[in-house]
Amino acid sequence: MQSFRERCGFHGKQQNYQQTSQETSRLENYRQPSQAGLSCDRQRLLAKDYYNPQPYPSYEGGAGTPSGTAAAVAADKYHRGSKALPTQQGLQGRPAFPGYGVQDSSPYPGRYAGEESLQAWGAPQPPPPQPQPLPAGVAKYDENLMKKTAVPPSRQYAEQGAQVPFRTHSLHVQQPPPPQQPLAYPKLQRQKLQNDIASPLPFPQGTHFPQHSQSFPTSSTYSSSVQGGGQGAHSYKSCTAPTAQPHDRPLTASSSLAPGQRVQNLHAYQSGRLSYDQQQQQQQQQQQQQQALQSRHHAQETLHYQNLAKYQHYGQQGQGYCQPDAAVRTPEQYYQTFSPSSSHSPARSVGRSPSYSSTPSPLMPNLENFPYSQQPLSTGAFPAGITDHSHFMPLLNPSPTDATSSVDTQAGNCKPLQKDKLPENLLSDLSLQSLTALTSQVENISNTVQQLLLSKAAVPQKKGVKNLVSRTPEQHKSQHCSPEGSGYSAEPAGTPLSEPPSSTPQSTHAEPQEADYLSGSEDPLERSFLYCNQARGSPARVNSNSKAKPESVSTCSVTSPDDMSTKSDDSFQSLHGSLPLDSFSKFVAGERDCPRLLLSALAQEDLASEILGLQEAIGEKADKAWAEAPSLVKDSSKPPFSLENHSACLDSVAKSAWPRPGEPEALPDSLQLDKGGNAKDFSPGLFEDPSVAFATPDPKKTTGPLSFGTKPTLGVPAPDPTTAAFDCFPDTTAASSADSANPFAWPEENLGDACPRWGLHPGELTKGLEQGGKASDGISKGDTHEASACLGFQEEDPPGEKVASLPGDFKQEEVGGVKEEAGGLLQCPEVAKADRWLEDSRHCCSTADFGDLPLLPPTSRKEDLEAEEEYSSLCELLGSPEQRPGMQDPLSPKAPLICTKEEVEEVLDSKAGWGSPCHLSGESVILLGPTVGTESKVQSWFESSLSHMKPGEEGPDGERAPGDSTTSDASLAQKPNKPAVPEAPIAKKEPVPRGKSLRSRRVHRGLPEAEDSPCRAPVLPKDLLLPESCTGPPQGQMEGAGAPGRGASEGLPRMCTRSLTALSEPRTPGPPGLTTTPAPPDKLGGKQRAAFKSGKRVGKPSPKAASSPSNPAALPVASDSSPMGSKTKETDSPSTPGKDQRSMILRSRTKTQEIFHSKRRRPSEGRLPNCRATKKLLDNSHLPATFKVSSSPQKEGRVSQRARVPKPGAGSKLSDRPLHALKRKSAFMAPVPTKKRNLVLRSRSSSSSNASGNGGDGKEERPEGSPTLFKRMSSPKKAKPTKGNGEPATKLPPPETPDACLKLASRAAFQGAMKTKVLPPRKGRGLKLEAIVQKITSPSLKKFACKAPGASPGNPLSPSLSDKDRGLKGAGGSPVGVEEGLVNVGTGQKLPTSGADPLCRNPTNRSLKGKLMNSKKLSSTDCFKTEAFTSPEALQPGGTALAPKKRSRKGRAGAHGLSKGPLEKRPYLGPALLLTPRDRASGTQGASEDNSGGGGKKPKMEELGLASQPPEGRPCQPQTRAQKQPGHTNYSSYSKRKRLTRGRAKNTTSSPCKGRAKRRRQQQVLPLDPAEPEIRLKYISSCKRLRSDSRTPAFSPFVRVEKRDAFTTICTVVNSPGDAPKPHRKPSSSASSSSSSSSFSLDAAGASLATLPGGSILQPRPSLPLSSTMHLGPVVSKALSTSCLVCCLCQNPANFKDLGDLCGPYYPEHCLPKKKPKLKEKVRPEGTCEEASLPLERTLKGPECAAAATAGKPPRPDGPADPAKQGPLRTSARGLSRRLQSCYCCDGREDGGEEAAPADKGRKHECSKEAPAEPGGEAQEHWVHEACAVWTGGVYLVAGKLFGLQEAMKVAVDMMCSSCQEAGATIGCCHKGCLHTYHYPCASDAGCIFIEENFSLKCPKHKRLP
């Protein structure tokens, strides 16, 4: 065994090393704790039977278990020592690499399996020890595996591909074994093998999981159990703890459950992919050196398999015996299994940290094992392990899925499609199998779609891509193709999927969670797969046509023969997972030294996408590819390796996914230019699609297909789906397939053409810093893609950026010789990678989507939504929705420009998009990609694909135009389809996914825009960059937030403009691309615009001018926008370039409406007039562009919002029509305010429509239809979560835009100005709850609805324009910019408002608002605005009663603090502020903004900083009062209206008192309602106190300590007022405290406790613990990534094991972060924390409320901190349920909200102390898992305050865990004299008994003792 291990050790080491490196990264990513040791541990565990021994604790320990075993260490050392060595040796020499695989199998199986008691391993062990006779060994092993097919098939693989098995291509490994299992497994998979596997195969899987971990045999065994990587992944998921607990632990530990999600993605995805990549590389080298060796078994097939899927057992796959069978079922099954599994535990887990964590024990281990297997693949070359890490969780499934999908898909899909037709070589070709898998997936999605995709995608793409891409990419990829050909083929097929997961990993927590979670279901996975297929098909159309067009496949199928592609994908993801961040950074740094390697790796990773195309090409060119692959692979083996490392790092951060595509972009610069182009094309497509796929996986398979459909549809539309990612490549792809059939020429052409985005942007903008980030993005189409995907997944955005950076670097190098860009971009990539890694890590805990990706977000769309919400909070935690979080975070660090813009944009996107998922959702991850949007997108894309496939096939330009048309159609169709599909998505209630999708789609749309005209292409990249990088913070904010998908698509030009202007300040550089870009968009959009906006324009120039200055003031984007607007407008409307710019800004809304109208028309016109449709799309784009240009921040945001709103779904048509901003807004606001948004949307949409109609002809046109739609959709929207539709269109979109602007530019610059109005509804969750609460408790709203229902119906549609305008302004604050601008034009008074409105958006908005409100709007507009706002809010109760409600809402608007006049402004400000907060809160703020959108006043209220969140619920209460504008003003004062009216921004205290008094009078019933009072309290902090005092304090559960002894404490838990006379707080005793905490948490922990006020508060005080207190504070870093966050007690990330989310952040009383200012600004600058929390406090305790947020009564601090952080958001919705305030508002805050449930530690929210990801309060941030806190002695949660945490942390530092031997144990055995201490997770793993009566623990030794 030792000799075998040594033998294998070399390989095993390589694998292990790779795992060490990769898995270290993975583990690090997965579980944030140091992962080097961990990966080592993993390797050790793998290398040794350490795994079996239960190295899990070690793994859990983090890097802790390095010394787990001497042998393990030795193996580790061997691996590590051989890290470079094995990588080089094993990689180069790798003579035993086949053996390595076998050895790996054997080492893992042998030593590990032996320990794992894998009997099967015994047999495999000997074979693995025969690395030399690998063929024989493999055969034996295979036989053994086959014999043990049920469980050891992985062994088969291990034997066959012992090397392959180790590859962590569980997929692939599983695939050869699947031959036996294929039939059974297919059923299993059909049955969601995950479950079957979980129950029947868990142990085998678990048992083999170690094998899997140790070698792919484990995977194979797992596969045999699971019958494929998917099964492996499923096994992971299915085999929860029981399966392979030892493994489980290591895997889990390795996977780091919280990061595990992402890690799962990374792990799952990368394990297969990364390992595969590494294996590919290793195999490449090994092939080089050991081709003969590998040939032993199947000289070439083994080579191919080992190269392509060495760890995929493709060596044996060469036999094809397994593949056909396994492939037929396995790919699907694998995917399905993976899907279910994904969806079940890993993905869901990824989607939401806990999911994976909770189900993941085995899953995790499996994932870990899988990555372990995988790691060897990417062994020494680069720490792919870490990179793999990224993909472990979500991607583990995808990875194996990809692998299996590749292999099995090839067998399965190929079987149906190619297998029969393809030669055995082809069959053995992993790429082919990948294609087959994809085909299978596609078939699963729908044979029709598949046929369409195949036929349509193959034909056009086949032409250009086939010849050029196929060969060139294949040759280049062949360098990296060997592995790809072998294992990566499957993985590539899966790679696209994997890459999507990779993308998802980026947004893994948002999106991957979506992806995996979504993948969890067959549909999602199939969709994902289809997505991959389509991604391939889209670029090469061949993906679907995989067998039809091998070359096309090569080009399109990144997973195809081009190992590079495969590898790129695999590397991308595996690198991502396996490469540690630092490692990757180093790699990046090193890569800078050897950009070639980076390029190679990047190209490879890009090729991963390209391989999608190549995969198909592989069908035809499989032999060629195979022939080429070995040598090529050898050639690029090392570079890919390094690159994979590089990529891995990126991917691991969820940047890797993008970077991979991006990297290949860089690579294409050199050898892989073609590949880069191709890969980028596909990779971006993949990534973009991943956003969609993962965003949409849950929504439906259709989503994936649709995504793909769009892509395939558009050769350019293909890019449409991946607009951003495909930005260049879609064009390039389209160009490649239609334009230029030269892959090489194409990449360069792309670099030049797509690089018009690249080169143009790189050339022009390349120099710009933004260029660095953005041009890099633009440069790297993949990056753009990533932007798209990232837009889809916030997380992905950074990857996109990174990729863009890398590719940008190389491309720029190529294009502009921008070595600076190379260095800068590389640096950016490094930073981005590191950041992305961070992001990924952060997202690990999360996307989406985090997750996401969110990606982002990643349950189904629902999950996405959940994820989005979760992501919203998570993203808040992460600093973006899901995704948006990691992405934003990484972006922020990534590059100053990118960081600022992209981060902000991402924050916006994440929060708006993800927040809306998610956010992923993006991506989302998104995380994470918008699920709803995705689904709708997918369907729309699909539809557009079907419709536009032909147009897309036209030609480069034709394709582009059709692409634009398609994009437009896809966008529009998506929007129209969204109405069709989105209804389902909406039904799925995935506003966030929608947002993600929107973002993605926006990006797509923008891409088609760009694609529409080659000139545009440059813009598009910029746009993509913008969305991705948010080139200009303004643009990023508005566009990123508003138009990641939509903004990107429709805002692309404007994004570009912005980007160009922002990046290369003048549009002059931008003009080439921008002018041309805007020209077509403007031409297209201009025509429509002229039609829609000509009138508007005329009226709007001055408003626009105001807006423009405002916008510029607000953000550079405005300036950029202006020039861009000029360009766009010029093209659009030759009449007034400058004017038009401004006009555009104002018109943005009109444009949005135009877009809406355009959409409306477009659905009818459809692709009828491609030009026209394109124009419309362009119009959409242009509108966004104009939006972007004119009201860059606002409009773009609006456009984005509108775009999002359409994406949202049911209201998609309405959404489509109302405004892109609306759509976008919907996404933005999707999380919570969807309903509110629906109401607001309705009222605003109506207002917006009316205003629109009023504003201009086009506007009128649109509004006419729109209002009807709105009206129609109003109630649907109302019912559905498309609140953002109308509301964003009206108010939110602009606010969102402004918010974006504010958030980006204003956040820093405007925050001072906006401080007064910055209302940070921090958490999407809170908003959601708020929306729900408000809906539930909105008597006044209902009253108002009843009061003014008569006029309501007519008003929305055609109320008096003035009223409508006002309503629009008030209700449609966001459209106000455009619509209000129109209205302003229409209404003299509004014109100033319009001007002020833009200003409002700007930091100066407030003053402008005040002025305008006071001057014109205050009187009539004010009333009307209030009315409008009332209407939106009233709309909530009655969607139809817009006018009456508006009127009744007048008061409400006032009550909401949305002054009638200022309402519009306020909406800007409020929404902007809210948006800013929302951006921060990512999804939560989206909810808040939704609230804001729901009532412009609400944001105002929020601005006021009290709890203006419940405008819908509570504003309703005050609405009676609200009707009285004066009184309302009082109420509004705290809201914002009063502030504006009276000029008091923060004088809400006195005002609230009045308002409160009024409210009391008017809402006498409400006071009786605890929730209602809470709301009131929230509204008025000062008055709240009075109120609280006046009223009997609300009862809070408490624990009375009867008696305290040394050992026992008698406590009485008082849960009801009658239970105990005196309310005691928690006792000191831990049990008591826990109990108390539980109790009080269970009750209205937040609300009741705080309301225990008066006596209660005072009484408990004596019993309050004397220990240090921590307050729940705001999440200081919006980029907080779950991956970065670890529990301060157990040091594990969120969702680690079953720990659930992390609660927090808790800050020491003395250092509550001052970042609240944003929150405070959002809430109220004056006492934001205090005031915001005061309302909450008030809700909780009036008196305590008085206490400062920090110094507030102990119970109150949580409230203040929480409210401070999410004051407005929580205050309003949470006001009702304060407990929600912390939990839901906060990401996973257990404390206030969760605390209600935390007591049940059923939720076991894990909060963890955030690793200070961001400077500032982060160092003081403490995140804790609920269970850890509850079970840790001396830690109590009292009234939201966490007592004793610091002490417990100090004590824990010295406590060694008896289980994992790591420091930090916090729970000790309660048995007298027992010294065993554990981490909570370790204790649960160790079998300790938790006694909930007293929260004590008994170790296994004493658990049976009395």
Curated annotation (Swiss-Prot):
Residues 996-1005, 1444-1453, 1535-1545 have a biased composition (Basic residues). Its main location: cytoplasm. One of its GO terms (biological process) is skeletal system development. The modification Phosphoserine is found at residues 339, 345, 568, 683, 805, 880, 892, 1064, 1122, 1352, 1358, 1374, 1431. Keywords: Activator, Biological rhythms, Cytoplasm, Isopeptide bond, Metal-binding, Nucleus, Phosphoprotein, Ubl conjugation, Zinc, Zinc-finger. SMART domains: PHD. Residues 66-75, 213-226, 278-291, 339-353, 1101-1119, 1242-1252, 1628-1637 have a biased composition (Low complexity). This is Retinoic acid-induced protein 1. A zinc finger (C2HC pre-PHD-type) spans 1780-1835. It comes from the Eukaryota. There is a cross-link at residues 819, 901 (Glycyl lysine isopeptide (Lys-Gly) (interchain with G-Cter in SUMO1)). It is linked to Smith-Magenis syndrome: Characterized by intellectual disability associated with development and growth delays. Affected persons have characteristic behavioral abnormalities, including self-injurious behaviors and sleep disturbance, and distinct craniofacial and skeletal anomalies. Transcriptional regulator of the circadian clock components: CLOCK, BMAL1, BMAL2, PER1/3, CRY1/2, NR1D1/2 and RORA/C. Positively regulates the transcriptional activity of CLOCK a core component of the circadian clock. Regulates transcription through chromatin remodeling by interacting with other proteins in chromatin as well as proteins in the basic transcriptional machinery. May be important for embryonic and postnatal development. May be involved in neuronal differentiation. A zinc finger (PHD-type) spans 1855-1903. Residues 950-962, 1798-1812 have a biased composition (Basic and acidic residues). InterPro entries: EPHD, Trans_Reg/Chrom_Remod, Znf_PHD, Znf_RING/FYVE/PHD. The modification Phosphothreonine is found at residues 472, 696, 1068. Residues 124-134 have a biased composition (Pro residues). It is found in: Cytoplasm; Nucleus. Expressed in all tissues examined with higher expression in the heart and brain. No expression was seen in the corpus callosum of the brain. The gene is RAI1. PROSITE patterns: EPHD. Disulfide bonds: none annotated. GO terms for molecular function: zinc ion binding.
